[in-house]
């Protein structure tokens, strides 16, 4: 975080990154002292409602964040910023998005939690668009021209007013991460899914909260002790914030978490709390052994849609096999229940650091914030939706193979599988049932070895 005082004192001359949050109501003219060098400008958390036309004079500006301000329209000056590729205006009051406001090189657009009812057809001309985040608006339709965005990989359209999921969307060649829960077209299926969930009701007074374990967009997770007639046990408790997130609505996440059921490669759910003193939706989950850690970090500003791994992270072939077997099994389990995870990424996987043969490479898939449900009886549509997630698995498999040592001929079949999962023709990709069978066939040819590379 920087300050206006630093800017005025000349302490930030030549800066490439600037982050200001000082309850600003106007764009500080002092920022223009950086127009020759500034690449990333973050004005999140102010009271701004407009940007100056002179913003187009910034010669190197690539990334602009103006979330949590008071904009009612996406500023048209953005369209004149020739190097701008990433634009974030989450949680404003934006109702209008004009064609003129869209930068030619746009890769990543965040308009979550606004009041947008329609988008311009010209959005489909943004050929470089990879990531589009529109959850929590008032959209009743998407521009059909988005079918031209062949590089689009991640799409968030949850919590809108969409009456149907466009057919062209399911044919986008690179789309891998999709969230659409909380729309009229999915409401009935979500209600049915919630009714089938066999979840224990856990009294709030039976829980004693401990330390905070983590915090995400949708809620805060604490360790806790659960008391019952059988004794006490350690659990994890997620307290949902209740607001719309970049992925969707917390109520949808909670419903899917309960409906997902038990699986050895999913983070287990013990039940829900319906009597929280503040009415806060609360989920009680299995407490994960500290020997499990996140497999990767989320995408960076530069990687856009690809996770960031520790530079020294490597896996043995046996550890890799255990991981991809576990992920494929978990995804297949969800698809059999009509659930699309929507965020099948390494950063949502916990993997075991334990070196025992029983635990080597074991993974747990969590975070249902982007999950959606679908009707498995509609086989053609279900197959298309499922194979979007197959592409996400292909990206993950490709990333893991790149970090596997030794990466010998025994893994050749997995390289071929990754290529098939990434095919541009959606229905030519294998199903998770096929994927699981092929991975098992490779695993059967391998011998047990130490997990450390």
Language-model-detected regions and their locations in the chain:
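Structural motif at the C-terminus of the N-lobe alphaC helix and the adjacent alphaC-beta4 loop
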Residues: 255-266
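C-lobe/activation-segment region of protein kinase-like
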Residues: 364, 368-416
């Amino acid at each position: 975080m920087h300050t206006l005082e630093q800017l005025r004192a000349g302490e930030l001359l030549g800066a490439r990154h600037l982050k200001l949050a000082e309850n600003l109501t106007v764009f500080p003219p002092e920022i223009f002292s950086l127009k020759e060098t500034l690449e990333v400008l973050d004005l999140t958390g102010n009271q701004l409602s407009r940007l100056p036309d002179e913003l187009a004079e910034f010669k190197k500006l690539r990334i602009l964040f103006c979330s949590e301000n008071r904009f009612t329209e996406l500023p048209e000056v953005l369209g004149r910023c020739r190097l701008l590729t990433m634009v974030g205006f989450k949680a404003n009051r934006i109702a209008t998005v004009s064609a003129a406001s869209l930068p030619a090189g746009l890769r990543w657009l965040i308009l979550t939690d606004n009041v947008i009812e329609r988008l311009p057809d010209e959005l489909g001309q943004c050929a470089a668009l990879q990531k589009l985040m529109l959850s929590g608006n008032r959209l009743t339709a998407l521009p059909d021209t988005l079918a031209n965005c062949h590089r689009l990989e991640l799409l968030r359209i949850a919590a809108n007013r969409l009456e149907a999921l466009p057919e062209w969307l399911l044919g986008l060649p690179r789309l891998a991460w999709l969230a659409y829960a909380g729309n009229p077209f999915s409401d009935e299926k979500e209600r049915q899914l919630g009714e089938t969930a066999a979840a224990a009701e856990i009294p709030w007074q039976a829980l004693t909260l401990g330390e905070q374990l983590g915090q995400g967009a949708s809620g805060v997770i604490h360790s806790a002790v659960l008391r019952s007639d059988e004794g006490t046990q350690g659990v994890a408790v997620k307290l949902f914030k209740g607001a719309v997130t970049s992925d969707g609505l917390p109520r949808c996440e909670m419903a899917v978490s309960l409906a997902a059921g038990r699986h050895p490669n999913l983070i287990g759910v013990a039940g829900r709390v319906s009597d929280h003193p503040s009415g806060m939706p609360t989920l009680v989950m299995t407490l994960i052994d500290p020997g499990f850690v996140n497999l990767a970090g989320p995408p960076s500003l530069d990687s856009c849609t690809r996770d960031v791994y520790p530079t020294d992270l490597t896996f043995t072939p046996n550890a890799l096999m255990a991981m991809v077997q576990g992920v494929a099994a978990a995804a297949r389990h969800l698809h059999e229940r009509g659930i699309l995870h929507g965020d099948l990424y390494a950063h949502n996987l916990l993997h075991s650091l334990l070196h025992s043969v029983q635990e080597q490479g074991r993974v747990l898939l969590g975070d249902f914030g982007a999950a959606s449900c679908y009707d498995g009886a509609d086989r053609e549509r279900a197959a298309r939706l499922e194979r979007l997630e197959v592409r996400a698995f292909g990206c993950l498999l490709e990333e893991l193979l790149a970090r596997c040592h030794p990466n010998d001929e025994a893994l050749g079949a997995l390289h071929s599988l990754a290529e098939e999962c990434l095919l541009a023709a959606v229905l030519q990709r294998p199903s998770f049932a096929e994927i699981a069978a092929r991975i098992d066939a490779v695993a059967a040819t391998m011998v047990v070895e130490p997990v450390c590379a």
